[in-house]
Amino acid sequence: MASLSPEIMDKGVIAASAGNHAQGVALSAKTLNTSAIIVMPKTTPEIKVKSVRGLGGEVILYGDNYDEASKRAEEIAKEKGLMIIPPYDDPHVVAGQGTVGMEILQQSKKDIDAIFVPVGGGLSLIHI
């Protein structure tokens, strides 16, 4: 998101996610002083919804699954002129997550025996 133009950032961003991506977009938006709408399936666990809201994201619960939420996010993006922040199929998103493994090694004060990675879409896993 840091690579987006000031014009885009002034409008805010939108994403569809049921978990980690939603939290990442909300936190990034807060850090970069813009707004984020996160469309999440109605089946999303309440703890994840609360986390996104706690990070400043506006949550819209829609649909029974990710595909339905994603389609709604696309509709809202067109209506409001917002940039969609995709969870995995974007070179900037992939590059941003590409530093995860390196950051773990740099920040660890001890040798690492194992790393446990939560897997939703799987993008974080490929960078470890």
Task: Identify what each model region corresponds to.
Residues M1-I126:
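PLP-dependent amino-acid enzyme catalytic core
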